[in-house]
Amino acid sequence: MSGHSKFANIKHKKEKNDAKKGKIFTIIGREIAVAVKDGGPDPENNSKLRDVIAKAKANNMPNDTIDRGIKKAAGDGDGVNYEEVTYEGYGPSGIAIIVKALTDNKNRTASNVRNAFTKGSGSVGTQGCVSYMFDEKGQIIISKEELEDNDIEVDADELMMLALDAGAEDFSDEEEAYEIITAPEDFSAVREVLEKENYPMASAEVTMIPQNYVTLTDENDIRQLNRTLDLLDEDDDVQNVYHNWDE
């Protein structure tokens, strides 16, 4: 099975984020807080929290930092309440962009997101204006380089059958990574099966995958889009940005 793998984009994003660990830990800290408030502090009984913990570990967040975040969220009844908000819009040449944020001030976040779009010659649209161009899917990336670094030998067919038997929809054997796609509701089960088999995951999350990708050839469009994406990346309220640009 194969598809349009975005491992190169994920790798680029991860390398970029490695220089911004503080921002990444802030993002995950908010996700931990929301997961705990939604389903309690016990990962055994809270699949959303288990998924966030797995994401934290994939980003090398120390265990004590994870534990402190869970304890703080569980005991901080009067703490900050974060609300999940989604914005949709267009970048240069009609590039579709979805922004997901966790915020304690929707007015501030809306203003910052709108500013990021405007400065990159884009515009925020109405809810649903571009989301129909994406599919919500669980996506697990297993880096071949990381497997090699950990002296882990993998039989691609065995890994594919393990993933599919656990409920995955698709499996891709790409040059640099194995990519596993699931329905959102099956993501946790598939991830946990792979985790039990000690497969190191470069990325494991429910994401928005474009149905089609758009190539930009105009250098000014590329500069403008990167400006928008950089501004969104710098905003602490922004958790994830999805787009259909084929970088």
Q: Where is each model-derived feature located?
A:
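N-terminal cationic and glycine-rich segments that engage phosphates or anionic surfaces
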Residues: 1-143, 186, 243-246
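Positively charged, low-complexity, intrinsically disordered RNA-binding extensions
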Residues: 141-247
